[in-house]
From Swiss-Prot:
It comes from the Bacteria. It comes from Vibrio vulnificus (strain YJ016). This is Nucleotide-binding protein VV0445. GTP binds at residues 56-59. One of its GO terms (molecular function) is GTP binding. SUPFAM superfamilies: P-loop containing nucleoside triphosphate hydrolases. Belongs to the RapZ-like family. InterPro entries: P-loop_NTPase, RapZ-like, RapZ-like_N, RapZ_C. NCBIfam families: PRK05416.1 (NF003828). ATP binds at residues 8-15.
Length: 287
C-alpha cells in the first residue's frame, strides 16, 4: 500500500489533486482529522489499494510539529509521500474573489480580512511545506494543467524514475517556487530590441537563428547541459522523483524559451522522461 498525504493552501488545488488520485485508483479520504491518521492507516495497512488523505488547515493540531513528527515516523514504516499544493498570494486572492468562497481561517479571531487569513495559513503550513516530497505551485495553471501535473508527478514517483521538468519564466513576473535549479540568462543578447523579432517567441525559427549567431548563447547552453549531465547520476541515486530546472530572462518570451526548449529536447533525445513548460507563454495564451 502507498499513502499520499495531500495538503496545501486553501484555493491552491487540493480538491483537484484528490480527484486526480481517485481517478488513478486511490482510495481517497477528504479532510481526515489528524488525530485519526495513525489509527486510519492501521485499519487500511493490509489493503492492496493505494490511499490518499487530504489534510485541511482547520484540522491540523495547534502545534504543527506534532503532525510533522507523526508523518516522519510513518515514513519509516510505510511508503508515504506528502503532496503540497502552493500558490502565490495574488493568485489566491483572485481565486477567492472570483468564487466568492469564504477562506477557512477568515472567521478565526486572528483574521478579519482574506489577506490576513492567507498570510496566517502560509505561516501555519510552512513546516509541512518544508518536508513535502512533491511541491506543486498552481499559480499559473488551469485546472487541466494542474491535473496533468499531479498525474505526471505521481506516476513518475510510482515508476521510481526521475522526471526532468524544464520551465522558462520571466523575472519580471517573479521566481518560480518549485525549481531545484534556476539559471539567469538576462545577460545574453536580447531579440526584444530587434523590431522584426519582438513579436516572436523563442520557439520561432528567426529567434533561434538570431540567438545561435552569438557564441555566448551556444556556450551557455553547452555549460548548462554539461552541469546537469554531471550531477544527474547522483540526483537519480538519491531517489528523487523529479528535477525542476528553471531558466529565466526578463520577460520569459525569447531567450529563456529558446534555451529551455533546446535543453529539454536534448535530454529527451537521450532517453530521459522530460516535460517542458513555458510559464509566461502559457499565461499569455490564457489571457
Amino acid at each position: 500500500m502507498r499513502l499520499i498525504v495531500v495538503s496545501g493552501h486553501s484555493g491552491a488545488g487540493k480538491s483537484v489533486a484528490l480527484r486526480v488520485l481517485e481517478d488513478m485508483g486511490y482510495y481517497c479520504v477528504d479532510n481526515l482529522p489528524v488525530n485519526l491518521l495513525e489509527s486510519f492507516i492501521q485499519s487500511v495497512s493490509e489493503s492492496k489499494q493505494n490511499v490518499a488523505v487530504s489534510i485541511d488547515v482547520r484540522n491540523i493540531p495547534k502545534k504543527l510539529k506534532e503532525l510533522t513528527t507523526t508523518l516522519q515516523k510513518l515514513k519509516s514504516s510505510i511508503d508515504l509521500s506528502i503532496l503540497f499544493l502552493d500558490a502565490d498570494k495574488a493568485t489566491l486572492l483572485k481565486r477567492y474573489s472570483e468564487t466568492r468562497r469564504v477562506h477557512p481561517l477568515s472567521l478565526s479571531d486572528e483574521c478579519h480580512t482574506l489577506d490576513q487569513a492567507i498570510d496566517l495559513e502560509k505561516k501555519m503550513l510552512k513546516p509541512l511545506k518544508e518536508i513535502a516530497d512533491i511541491l506543486l505551485n498552481s499559480s499559473n495553471q488551469s485546472l487541466h494543467d494542474l491535473s496533468e501535473d499531479v498525474r505526471y508527478r505521481i506516476e513518475g514517483k510510482e515508476r521510481n524514475k526521475l522526471i526532468m521538468v524544464f520551465e522558462s519564466f520571466g523575472f519580471k513576473f517573479g521566481l518560480p517556487t518549485d525549481a531545484d535549479y534556476v539559471f539567469d540568462v538576462r545577460f545574453l543578447p536580447n531579440p526584444h530590441w530587434e523590431p522584426a523579432l519582438r513579436p516572436m517567441t523563442g520557439l520561432d525559427a528567426p529567434i533561434k537563428t538570431f540567438l545561435e549567431s552569438h557564441d555566448e548563447v551556444l556556450e551557455l547552453k553547452r555549460q548548462i547541459q554539461t552541469f546537469i549531465e554531471h550531477w544527474l547520476p547522483l540526483l537519480e541515486k538519491n531517489n528523487r522523483s523529479y528535477l525542476t530546472v528553471a531558466i529565466g530572462c526578463t520577460g520569459g518570451k525569447h531567450r529563456s524559451v529558446y534555451l529551455t526548449q533546446q535543453i529539454g529536447e536534448y535530454f529527451a533525445a537521450m532517453g530521459h522522461t522530460v516535460k517542458i513548460r513555458h510559464t509566461t507563454l502559457e499565461k499569455r495564451n490564457k489571457e
